[in-house]
């Protein structure tokens, strides 16, 4: 009940394609970073989770509410601007949340530096399947470690695991 009855944000984020989502107000910008969004914008602030959900359900009839993690990791950034996308969606916002529009929209760019880009995700490591993961780490995006060979590992899926880590510095 405490989580539901607090301010929530309805947002658009670009994680390779623009999507709609909701989060508790105090989770920004953490939520966008976790998703690997390269741009995001809060568009509605509701007093509770229910009203944010009403808006999200209405908008997901016109725009996805899912992140395609493979697209996000290959940095296949489309050139859609979240502000322009929102302008096209405003007429689809339900009447009961129209007074929740955020007056000053702020398009937030987020940068995830990589040593190099990967063209394709070739493998997703799982410590449950193989407890040994080796590779050269070239980047971190969202919840993922990205390795030179195109393999990735979702760190959030491994919460609670105890690991050992050997780090070698490569000379270039």
Language model feature labels by segment:
Residues 1-172:
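Non-catalytic accessory segments flanking enzymatic or RNA/DNA-binding domains
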């Amino acid at each position: 009940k405490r989580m539901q009855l607090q301010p929530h944000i309805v947002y658009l984020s670009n994680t390779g394609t623009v999507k709609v989502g909701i989060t508790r107000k105090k989770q920004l910008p953490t939520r966008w970073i976790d998703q690997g969004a390269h741009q995001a914008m809060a568009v509605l602030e509701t007093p509770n989770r229910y009203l944010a959900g009403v808006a999200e359900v209405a908008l997901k009839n016109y725009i996805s509410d899912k992140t395609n993690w493979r697209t996000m990791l290959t940095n296949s950034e489309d050139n859609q601007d979240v502000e322009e996308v929102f302008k096209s969606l405003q007429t689809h916002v339900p009447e009961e949340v129209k007074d929740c529009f955020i007056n000053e929209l702020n398009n937030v760019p987020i940068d995830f530096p990589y040593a190099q880009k990967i063209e394709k995700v070739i493998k997703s490591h799982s410590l449950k399947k193989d407890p040994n993961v080796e590779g050269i780490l070239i980047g971190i995006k969202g919840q993922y470690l990205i390795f030179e060979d195109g393999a990735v590992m979702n760190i959030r899926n491994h919460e609670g695991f105890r690991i050992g880590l050997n780090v070698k510095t490569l000379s270039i």
